[in-house]
């Protein structure tokens, strides 16, 4: 109930306060049922009512409380913070350094993100003469798309990202559209907000080049996007001589995970070439 329904809809802060309110109400109800056996029933009732009022107020102002707490967590100014049904999105800024955090984990800094996104896109795309159809899985920030659109041969880019709040934010916020060069609003772009695994299962399109830009596999829902089942689906959607590039953690800080992903790709028939940017 907590991870499937409440947390995605209400957020972690509001859900936690809701359970606290339920506990306070249960305590108050129990005290009232046994009021004849409890000598301090009036004080207990006042305490339960007071706790319930405070928790109810906390539920009402949960978003503001979360933002205030994040102001203490992040060293830079928080310019955007919102909980979507899928994740907590926070954007910070210090001078010209804009950073994206998802569930508290740094995803990029505008000062050096180009090193990652250029390395993610250009080696693979330059190996394909006249690639026309491109698939981007994840990458709702539009930064990988920005690099893809530098190729005149590209006619269409399909972006599949689970969270509509991410693609909305990075296609509308002026600071972020400057960063991704308004890539998500290009007429060549088709944005689909869906689970990438399920979308690949149902879709029959073929692509010359695929960019798989998911966060590191830190939980089950992300881990399934690094499995043999997922990579088999991906391979079926590549055209003849098609190429896919996969974000594969770090060979320095997550060496075992990195090489596990390489071996998983090889096991489904990919000719995998591992590389990383310095």
Question: Which role does the model predict for each range below?
Answer:
Residues 1-34:
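Membrane-embedded alpha-helical segments of integral membrane proteins
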Residues 106-119:
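Conserved SAM-binding loop and adjacent beta-strand
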